[in-house]
């Protein structure tokens, strides 16, 4: 079941406002409708809110490559069969292939993002003997148990309502001795951008809406992995700040990499209003730094 309250960093006033809205969302059922939540995230990454998502790699490639390299430093994928849950444009999957994995299955909820991954793989000359593509839901993965040597996932878990059961599902697919490696959203990820966005959106539009986002502390992810039956569990936190020339550049990074999925809850006219208010707020403040806060987590399925 999704968490009711906001789990990331916000200023005290903004967090109070967010949690008041979340409580209403729980009572009305919005915060318990996992299927609708996942559908909104999917629509966001298919461009329902902003065309900026089409510039995902333009603004986010360096950022997500840094995260992906940090994640894969902790495991050996040489000759392994790998599943990438929530592959996006394929940054993590293609890096795994570059580092010697035998075969990668790239899975994502968004048809658009999966298509981008396929195009990049084809351009690099990877055929079906090395890579495959599947539309999938991370909470119900369409594979037999014990199918993969490694399951990897980059910056996806924070968008999933039922995180504990998702980790259990990933572990189910591992062969004995297989490795799960995940990067996910820490409490301060994009803090400055989220704070400005929350404050700039008209409150009557978002009241009673629980945004589909659940960042976690390092100890929470460690516990999830251990409770899912993994051994040799280890985690580490990775943080830095990205700097931008001006507020508009910061907004373009945030809009393209987040796809502003939460706005899919709104009608088209309100989407335009909210998007413009957020952009204007970024420019006026101006937002010139955005925090990256990542949890890297690893665990092994007992042999």
Specify the residue positions occupied by each region the protein language model found.
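A short SAM/SAH-binding and catalytic strip from SAM-dependent methyltransferases
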Residues: 150-162
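Conserved Class I S-adenosyl-L-methionine
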Residues: 5-8, 14-31, 60-62, 89, ...
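Class I SAM-dependent methyltransferase SAM/SAH-binding core
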Residues: 83-85, 89-140
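Conserved class I S-adenosyl-L-methionine
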Residues: 4-77, 91-95, 113-116, 125, 181-203
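Residues lining the SAM
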Residues: 107, 154-157, 183
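A short glycine-rich, Lys/Arg-flanked "PGG" loop and its adjoining helix->strand segment in the class I
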Residues: 164-179
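A short acidic, Gly/Pro-enriched loop at the edge of an enzyme's catalytic core
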Residues: 139-150
């Amino acid at each position: 079941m999704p968490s009711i309250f906001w789990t990331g960093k916000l200023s005290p006033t903004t967090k109070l406002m967010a949690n008041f809205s979340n409580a209403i969302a729980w009572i009305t059922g919005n915060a318990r409708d996992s299927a609708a939540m996942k559908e909104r995230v999917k629509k966001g990454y298919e461009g329902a809110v902003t065309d900026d998502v089409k510039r995902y790699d333009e603004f986010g490639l360096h950022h997500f490559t840094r995260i992906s390299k940090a994640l894969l430093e902790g495991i050996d994928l040489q000759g392994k069969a790998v599943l990438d849950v929530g592959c996006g444009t394929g940054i993590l999957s293609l890096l795994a292939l570059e580092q010697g994995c035998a075969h990668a299955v790239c899975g994502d909820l968004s048809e658009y993002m999966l298509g981008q991954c396929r195009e990049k793989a084809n351009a690099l000359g990877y055929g079906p003997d090395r890579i495959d593509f599947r539309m999938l839901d991370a909470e119900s993965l369409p594979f037999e148990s014990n199918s993969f040597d490694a399951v990897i996932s980059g910056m996806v878990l924070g968008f999933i309502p039922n995180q504990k059961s998702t980790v259990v599902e990933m572990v189910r697919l591992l062969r004995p001795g297989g490795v799960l490696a995940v990067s996910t959203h820490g409490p301060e990820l994009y803090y400055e951008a989220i704070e400005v966005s929350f404050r700039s959106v008209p409150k009557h539009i978002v009241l009673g809406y629980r945004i589909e986002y659940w960042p976690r502390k390092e100890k929470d992810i460690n516990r999830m992995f251990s409770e899912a039956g993994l051994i040799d569990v280890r985690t580490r936190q990775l943080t830095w700040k990205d700097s931008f020339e001006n507020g508009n550049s910061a907004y373009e990074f945030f809009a393209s990499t987040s796809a502003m999925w939460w706005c899919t809850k709104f009608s088209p006219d309100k989407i335009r209003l909210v998007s413009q208010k957020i952009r204007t707020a970024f420019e006026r403040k101006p937002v010139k730094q955005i925090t990256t806060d990542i949890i890297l987590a690893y665990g092994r399925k007992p042999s």
